[in-house]
Amino acid sequence: MRLRTAIATLCLTAFTSATSNNSYIATDQTQNAFNDTHFCKVDRNDHVSPSCNVTFNELNAINENIRDDLSALLKSDFFKYFRLDLYKQCSFWDANDGLCLNRACSVDVVEDWDTLPEYWQPEILGSFNNDTMKEADDSDDECKFLDQLCQTSKKPVDIEDTINYCDVNDFNGKNAVLIDLTANPERFTGYGGKQAGQIWSTIYQDNCFTIGETGESLAKDAFYRLVSGFHASIGTHLSKEYLNTKTGKWEPNLDLFMARIGNFPDRVTNMYFNYAVVAKALWKIQPYLPEFSFCDLVNKEIKNKMDNVISQLDTKIFNEDLVFANDLSLTLKDEFRSRFKNVTKIMDCVQCDRCRLWGKIQTTGYATALKILFEINDADEFTKQHIVGKLTKYELIALLQTFGRLSESIESVNMFEKMYGKRLNGSENRLSSFFQNNFFNILKEAGKSIRYTIENINSTKEGKKKTNNSQSHVFDDLKMPKAEIVPRPSNGTVNKWKKAWNTEVNNVLEAFRFIYRSYLDLPRNIWELSLMKVYKFWNKFIGVADYVSEETREPISYKLDIQ
């Protein structure tokens, strides 16, 4: 009987503690538990990587200084437009399944050409592509854009296509359309499921170097970090621009960010690594910018902003010579280039138009950065001028846009860190409530209650005597007659068995009531279960089979011990 009472008290105490929001007060020990979580658990004074002679704090400072000018630069008429074939056939598998039918997946193309500046008009674009030198083949037309745009007198020299890390002819196809990037921002579209998982699985498993290969050279490790940082940067953008279905507004989603990025310090680190790689590529072409300074087609203000951005970068931000220092060979370099070119082609298999657009832009930007860093021979000035001179306008736009995406990712990481801190220290801190009302604290308080109950059961008579004695001391000034103690008759064993019988009867009745209520609730439970199955089947039918599972239903209950 006493044990049953104690167990009942335990259950009641546990339920009360679990459902109360203010059961406990946060202690220093709880605060230490918060500090041990994995959000950006990186020493900001450490270097980003062995090939980067710059710390996380230094990159944050650089990004803060250039952020305004970079944002204005990317919104200018020259850099905010991009040309792309959105419906190029996937060359890896049949990608007709899993189409994203959400309006957020679509892309708004430019139809009113009259609103475009002169250098984006069709006849101007056509002249750039057609007025080429006779000795060059058609595939080199677009590569000579910057030379023609700036009316340089230097004759271009033919160069093999083997230096490209992406297919530069993707932007001149007959099905290519012009897109205003400011009207199609990168944000959460709801695209996901098995098809999206297949994209990243193919990139990591079939194109990244294997675990046995990585660690043997910085080049192979750098390839994986580029892909991982690219993936993490996309996740950060989607977390920042997430549709709140209750308010209808696009706003940051801390829970989604934590589930995808915040709990994984290596992913945050790889984003900073990518930032350093692209920044060094921009710094490396700075001496050649006057040679294709857009010939007065871009106003002076935009030129100044571009100079302000690149001038604050430094050569120490990334040492590309160290990446291939010990194993620079044509075979490894060709393999590196071939694998990354495959990554850019895999973007054609993405069935969300908006996702494909930004995937192609950013992979093209990374490909351009790699070409600048690894194909320009510092000892050969002629080769440097030649490679930079053959950059297409789309490569240059993609390079700046990719740097802008990484800049926004770095800014978003710091923003999410502040949001995370406010949640930990806020009055409505559900994560704090988890640590304060966790199962072990509940058991601790329940154990106290059990001990108290058992002590009361075992010392009822002693408790009464102590109470009477304490009362006599409290009212010592009153002369009260002593109460006459009349012994009550005790039936002994009879009362004991009677109480036990009544208790067991009540338990049986309660069990029958539980079974009865379960049968009453059965139709409703079957209806809800069937509705959920139909809902999942419908999502699978329209191509978003795992859409529900990607949302964090219990966002605060992440596994903070994940490495």
Curated annotation (Swiss-Prot):
Topological type in the membrane: Peripheral membrane protein
InterPro entries assigned: Ero1, ERO1-like_sf
EC numbers for this chain: 1.8.4.-
Post-translational modification: The Cys-100/Cys-105 and Cys-352/Cys-355 disulfide bonds constitute the redox-active center. The Cys-100/Cys-105 disulfide bond may accept electron from PDI1 and funnel them to the active site disulfide Cys-352/Cys-355.
Source domain of life: Eukaryota
BP term (GO), one: protein folding in endoplasmic reticulum
Sorted UniProt keywords: Disulfide bond, Electron transport, Endoplasmic reticulum, FAD, Flavoprotein, Glycoprotein, Membrane, Oxidoreductase, Redox-active center, Signal, Transport
Catalytic site: C352, C355
Induction: By unfolded protein response (UPR).
GO cellular-component term (any): endoplasmic reticulum
Cellular localization per UniProt: Endoplasmic reticulum membrane
Cofactor: FAD
Short name of one Pfam family: ERO1
Residues binding FAD, per UniProt: R187, T189, W200, S228, H231, R260
Disulfide bonds: C90-C349, C100-C105, C143-C166, C150-C295, C352-C355
Enzyme category, top tier: oxidoreductase
Cross-referenced SUPFAM superfamilies: ERO1-like
Family: Belongs to the EROs family.
Description of its domains: The C-terminal part (437-563) is required for the association with the endoplasmic reticulum lumen membrane.
Name used for this protein in its record: Endoplasmic oxidoreductin-1
